[in-house]
Regions:
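Phosphodiester-processing cores and adjacent nucleic acid-binding clamps
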Residues: 1-255
Length: 255
């Protein structure tokens, strides 16, 4: 089976939206044979510490093995033949580590995040993932600014600050609530193209157009979402070919 990692996931820290606890999400991903999972709660990173601690606990045995192998490698009494074999064993052990990916589904304002002009400007969704330590620090900075300077119904960030703190981040275009999907649904295809090119111009290969397909199977579910996703996906796949932007498939996990 093709490896898959969830990159768009809401925990119970997505207030009044997500239902799953972080341990339940991690345990389910591990049970399904996944190498990692991202937590991308709406507008906040409240669950990141719990996420990190729980994954560290789940990785305890593997980390213990890696530590033991490194100690053996550093031991001057280890036989040369054994020493030569240890690096490969360490790399093999690292493959068994479950990877926590820190992220946030941010709200991006249409104008400056400090402007409180349009009450409807609660922000367009954007999935932001930390690629490395620098990205983690930039993500924390952006989320903090969204709360302290950009809050207007929701904690919002703007493109000026996204560009300023872009280093080390991976960006995904998000769900139907993202700026590009919303423009596509409104028939503003050329505007959507311009926005995609803006993101690509800053993040390059670290910018992805996000495909989702959630077909409702129960009567009380929202059956309007799936056909809209199919419509948006067709345009996103066309953009991918025309603009050279990579695609990523996600599920908008809430429970």
């Amino acid at each position: 089976m093709q490896p898959f990692v969830h990159l768009h996931v809401h925990s119970q820290y997505s207030i009044l939206d997500g239902q799953a606890s972080i341990p339940a999400l991690v345990d389910k991903a591990i049970a399904n044979g996944m190498r990692g999972i991202a937590i991308t709660d709406h507008g906040n990173m409240f669950g990141i510490k719990e996420f990190f601690n729980y994954v560290e606990k789940k990785n305890g045995d593997v980390n213990g093995l890696i530590k033991s192998l490194k100690k053996e490698l550093d031991n001057g009494e280890t036989a040369p033949e054994r020493r030569a074999a240890i690096p490969a064993e360490i790399e093999e052990a690292k493959k068994k580590l479950f990877i926590p990916i820190f992220g946030c589904e941010m709200y991006v304002s249409l104008g400056a995040m400090t402007e409180h002009i349009d009450k409807k400007d609660t922000g367009r969704h954007l999935v932001v993932l930390a690629k490395n330590e620098k990205g983690y620090h930039n993500l924390v900075k952006l989320v903090s600014l969204a709360w302290t300077d950009g809050f207007y119904s929701h904690p919002r960030i703007d493109k000026e600050h996204l560009e300023k703190y872009h280093e080390g981040l991976i960006i995904c275009s998000a769900c139907l609530g993202g700026e590009i999907p919303r423009l596509i649904q409104a028939g503003e295809i050329e505007k959507a193209r311009e926005v995609a090119l803006w993101f690509k111009g800053i993040w390059g290969d670290d910018y992805y157009l996000e495909l989702q397909r959630h077909k409702a199977t129960v009567p009380r579910a929202n059956h309007d979402v799936y056909p809209r996703q199919v419509e948006v996906n067709e345009v996103l796949m066309r953009f991918s070919k025309e603009l050279g932007i990579k695609l990523v498939c996600t599920n908008d996990v809430h429970f």
